Amino acid sequence: MRALLSAPGRRPLSPPRALIAALAVALAAPAAAVQMSDVAPMAGMSALAAAQDEAEGASPTAERAVKAAYLYKFLGYVDFPGGPLDPGAPYVVGVAGAEDVAGELARQTSGRMVNNHAVVVRRLHDGDGAAGLHLLFIGAAEGGAEAALVKAAQAAGALSVTESATGIEAGSVINFVLVDERVRFEVSLAAAERGRLKLSSRLLSVAYAVQKGGG
């Protein structure tokens, strides 16, 4: 990876550009079909986490890119309560309160597949429900609506992902945190169980923290 960031004869990339370049490599490996009993190597998530360590820190642009990349990768590491998707059906990702992440996610997933399924990004507005979603990302701008959106995602069997200090407390399955200026994520297994979601051990192995009870 370092050869990509600082190849001989090339000017070293700035941290944000270096991070985005590294993410492109991490995203190149498609996510494999996920079952809790899978033993096949699934390096995509680990590569994505390691990509940030090649950069000095996260600018707003880089932070947005990393979060979008994680959201894309999360889809391939979760068994949803409805079972495998029908052939030709897309994964649907809803985004509330984070227009910048929605735009970046749409860009990153354009033409890409997860388990042979396309990814559709849906921007949610006030009053929109979570029905039909597989993942709901709730931006920090939602504030007081966070808990209600998390509850709606749980009822719909969708993976909830937040980015606030109260995300796990509000019942979110995954919450983004900044650690030493790098985007990491924490997981609530209790919340996943309430939403009838099974998370791959590969995903859990690269989480910053895993809460096993409560939350």
Protein language model features and the residues they cover:
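Short hydrophobic alpha-helices and adjacent helix-cap/hinge residues
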Residues: 2-215
